[in-house]
Amino acid sequence: MTIGKILLYYCFTPIEDPTAIMLWQRSLCEKLGLKGRILISEHGINGTVGGDMDACKRYVRETREYPGFKKMEFKWSEGGAEDFPRLSVKVRDEIVAFGAPGELKVDENGVIGGGVHLKPEEVNKLVEERGEEVVFFDGRNAMEAEIGKFKNAVVPDVRTTHDFIAELESGKYDWMKDKPVVSYCTGGIRCEILSALMKNRGFNEVYQIDGGIVRYGEKYGNDGLWEGSMYVFDKRMHHEFGQGLEDPGFIQLGHCVHCGKGTNTFHNCINEDTCRKQVLICDDCIQHVETQHCGRPDCAEVAASQAQA
């Protein structure tokens, strides 16, 4: 019986010919039977792929043969190719779509001018030394924080990474500009860019967590500053640390929009024409068509009409 694994990785490094790297990566993944999503730009590579563990090991070895990716870190998690609908390898202007390709600068050491990297234990030390002065700033989409975030974190009202620049320039967060700000995201890639954007806009003391929530959760489980589940962009939808949902230290943050029952599972609103918003709906409520909506009155009407059909 084969064992499946999922790889999460990124690397910021100058790439002269992104198309050539794209073709090589696509061929490599097809040869190894991997599925997932890989984005490549002149700034680097960003990928999540899944497949047989031996195939994943070979993928890591062969990908690191490219000089710019030699030191790239790969994060391993449970899962496999079945967690992805297909293989997608594409060239983009940005490997994370903040809408600022001209602002991002990279060299062989990574992003130029980004926030200071902190290991998980250094994050805890910073909080111990400076207490409530420290601000955790969520670098993900606001929806992701509904099921998990750092304790007392500031969660910007953004639906996509494209919204961050306008949000930072809105003045809402000027009170943070002279405070120690710890930016965080799933695996660290979004905060590589976000922390640089923040520094460019006058935030004076910006940090980022090395390896993101993934590494912090692996280190501390449910006994640190992280609360709840981590949203993931594959069929699993969410990931728990430590002993999972049964861990004595686990804090349930996500709740069904209809009945309030604890849940970490997102579903698309039934109103496919004008909504499709992802919302938390528990296993019981999702069984009934009339509660397969986001809660908006017009979406509730769509659900009700389909239930009667």
UniProtKB/Swiss-Prot annotation:
tRNA processing as a keyword?
yes
Which residue positions does the secretion signal occupy? none
List, for all copies, the residue spans of the domain called Rhodanese: 130-225
Q: Which EC numbers characterise this protein's activity in its record?
A: 1.14.-.-
**Keyword match Glycoprotein:** no
**What class does this enzyme belong to in the EC scheme?**
oxidoreductase
Q: Which GO terms describe its molecular function?
A: oxidoreductase activity, acting on paired donors, with incorporation or reduction of molecular oxygen
Which cysteines are cross-linked by disulfides?
Answer: none
Write out the similarity annotation.
Belongs to the TrhO family.
Output the NCBIfam families linked to this UniProt entry: PRK00142.1-2 (NF001134)
Describe the task this protein carries out. Catalyzes oxygen-dependent 5-hydroxyuridine (ho5U) modification at position 34 in tRNAs.
Q: What is this protein called?
A: tRNA uridine(34) hydroxylase
Q: Supply the source organism's classification.
A: Bacteria, Bacillati, Actinomycetota, Actinomycetes, Mycobacteriales
GN (gene name): trhO
